C-alpha cells in the first residue's frame, strides 16, 4: 500500500549499484554477478513489480549491493517521482549506475532518456555496442547521461558536432 501512496523510504546516499537493463536481461545480470562473486559476498536483487516496496526497505537499510531493474520500471518510477516526489530510484545518490543496452536512451525526448539522466550517481557506465544507430544525435543522450561536459549540453553538442557533421565538415567527420 505504501508504494501507491508515496510513503517509500528515502535513500540519501547508498553504496549500492543500480543496473538498468532490458527486462529480458535482468536474470542474466543476476546470474553473472552471482557467478562472478563468492557465495554470500554480494547481495543482488531484482527491482520490479510487486517486490519493489520490500526491496526499497532493504535498500534504505543498506542491505543490498546491487539492484537490477528494467527500463520500464525506471520510467514508471520517474513518472511517479515527477508526480509525487516519491521514488526510491530517484530519492538519493547511487554509488554507481550502469545502463546496459544504453542505446535504449538514444532519443533524448523519451521518458527513459530523461529518467536515466535524472538518476544521481557517483559513477556512471553506459554499455552499448551501438552508440550511434541512426543519427549522430543518438550519441547525445549517452554523453548527457555520462555527464561528459560540455558535450552533455544540447546546444554545445549541436553547435560543435551535430550541425557541422550534417554539413559534412571535414574536421568533424574526422573526429566522429
Q: Where are the model-predicted features located?
A:
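SF2 helicase/translocase NTPase motor core
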Residues: 1-99, 106-107, 161-167
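Conserved P-loop NTPase motor "coupling/switch" region that bridges the ATPase
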Residues: 96, 104, 113-176
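Short alpha-helix within the catalytic core of nucleotide-sugar-dependent glycosyltransferases
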Residues: 110
Amino acid at each position: 500500500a505504501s508504494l501507491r501512496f508515496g510513503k517509500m523510504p528515502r535513500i540519501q546516499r547508498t553504496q549500492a549499484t543500480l543496473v538498468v537493463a532490458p527486462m529480458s536481461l535482468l536474470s542474466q545480470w543476476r546470474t553473472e554477478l552471482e557467478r562472478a562473486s563468492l557465495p554470500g559476498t554480494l547481495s543482488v536483487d531484482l527491482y520490479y513489480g510487486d517486490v519493489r516496496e520490500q526491496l526499497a526497505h532493504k535498500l534504505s537499510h543498506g542491505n543490498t549491493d546491487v539492484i537490477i531493474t528494467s527500463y520500464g520500471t525506471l520510467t514508471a518510477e520517474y513518472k511517479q517521482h515527477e508526480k509525487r516526489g516519491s521514488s526510491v530510484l530517484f530519492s538519493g545518490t547511487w554509488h554507481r549506475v550502469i545502463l546496459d543496452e544504453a542505446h535504449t536512451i538514444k532519443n533524448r525526448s523519451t521518458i527513459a532518456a530523461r529518467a536515466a539522466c535524472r538518476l544521481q550517481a557517483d559513477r556512471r557506465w553506459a554499455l552499448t555496442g551501438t552508440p550511434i544507430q541512426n543519427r549522430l544525435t543518438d550519441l547525445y543522450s549517452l554523453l548527457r547521461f555520462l555527464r561528459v561536459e560540455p558535450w552533455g549540453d544540447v546546444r554545445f553538442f549541436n553547435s560543435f558536432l551535430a550541425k557541422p557533421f550534417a554539413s559534412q565538415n571535414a574536421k568533424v567527420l574526422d573526429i566522429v
